[in-house]
């Protein structure tokens, strides 16, 4: 075993599907077997213990999803950015993870309460440490990404998720050793797929089928391990098709399957159940390229459907929004006014969105 990699896990003593906050939970309320969940978790634990040191955080009653430690936060070096959970059903986990990191001497950063960010579930480091892939669209806000750049001194590449089945980045995207990337392209918008193609050469990209995607093949743990003086690249996952296993084998990876079907009922698998707490910092500080603008709208915003068209335009263009002010006219014939903060992953996307918004009648606020 090697001490180079440390992974945080949480025993599933209180795990169950108690509510619905993603599509996988629908129809599975209280249909998970605690006994099988314990057995599958321990099998994963034993597999990973072969390749890494496993740290544990104590499970807490009332917080069944605490077992998914990938969402505790994002760790680089001795710094952690704690999660701000989108759903109230998970927000009670935050202080327990905060105490765990503080007790071990990490520098802990916390985002504003109004800014959701779900840790390493939505932020995955390129395995060479060159940049951080960060997801947004369902659980994490794009406006959280500049904080990651500032606090962690890392280049952040923002990817927009568009398939609600793949609500976290780590459910459909897995950076691997030596620049390889395992991912499900249909989970991303066009801009994000173009960005992936620009950063990852074609020979390094491993797009997977929907069949493998719904088995959470991308929700995998990749560990490099030295065995008898020989380097071994291990990918631990719930399940992979024969074709995918062959593709990975041809690229020098050893696939280790371990069933995690009880956790799929809650929308998670191997990666969701783990958090790597030994991620090295990149060497050079980076600046954020994420853009923000404020626009002003005035008119019969609701009756005309203008406000909905504006917000839809922002999202369809690859951006995100926050309504800062909305003043509704007192009478039906009165006009309404709104201020909306628009965020985009880079200047080109912002320029395209702003052009469309101005065509709709929006005014850019200096």
PLM features per residue range, with description:
Residues 1-285:
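The feature marks the mature, well-folded catalytic cores of soluble enzymes
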Residues 288-366:
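A conserved regulatory-domain signal marking ACT and ACT-like small-molecule sensing domains
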């Amino acid at each position: 075993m090697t001490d180079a990699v440390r992974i945080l896990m949480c025993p599933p003593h209180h795990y169950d599907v108690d509510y619905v906050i993603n599509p996988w939970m629908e129809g599975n309320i209280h249909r998970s077997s605690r006994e099988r969940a314990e057995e599958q978790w321990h099998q994963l634990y034993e597999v990973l213990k072969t390749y890494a040191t496993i740290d544990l955080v104590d499970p807490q009653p009332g917080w069944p999803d605490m077992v998914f430690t990938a969402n505790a936060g994002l760790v680089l070096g001795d710094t952690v950015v704690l999660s701000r959970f989108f759903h109230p059903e998970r927000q009670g986990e935050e202080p327990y993870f905060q105490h765990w990191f503080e007790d071990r001497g990490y520098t802990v950063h916390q985002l504003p309460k109004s800014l959701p960010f779900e840790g390493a579930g939505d932020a995955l480091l390129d395995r060479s440490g060159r940049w951080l892939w960060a997801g947004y669209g369902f659980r994490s806000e794009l406006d959280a990404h500049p904080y990651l750049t500032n606090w962690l001194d890392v280049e952040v590449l923002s990817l927009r998720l568009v398939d609600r089945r793949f609500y976290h980045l780590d459910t459909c995207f897995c950076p691997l050793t030596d620049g390889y990337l395992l991912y499900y392209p249909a989970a991303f918008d066009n801009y994000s797929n173009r960005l992936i193609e620009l950063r990852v050469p074609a020979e390094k990209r491993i797009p997977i089928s929907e069949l493998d995607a719904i088995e959470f093949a991308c929700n995998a743990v990749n560990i490099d391990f030295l065995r008898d003086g020989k380097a071994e690249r291990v990918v631990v996952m719930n399940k992979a098709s024969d074709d995918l296993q062959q593709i990975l084998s041809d690229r020098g990876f050893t696939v280790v399957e371990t069933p995690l079907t009880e956790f799929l009922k809650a929308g998670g698998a191997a990666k969701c159940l783990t958090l790597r707490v030994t991620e090295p910092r990149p060497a050079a500080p980076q600046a954020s390229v994420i853009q923000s603008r404020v626009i002003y709208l005035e008119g019969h915003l609701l009756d005309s459907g203008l406000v909905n068209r504006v917000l839809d335009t922002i999202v369809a263009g690859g951006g995100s929004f926050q309504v800062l002010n909305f003043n509704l006219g007192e009478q039906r014939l009165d006009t309404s006014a709104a201020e909306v903060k628009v965020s985009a992953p880079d200047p080109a996307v912002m320029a395209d969105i702003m052009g469309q918004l101005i065509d709709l009648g929006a005014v850019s606020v200096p």
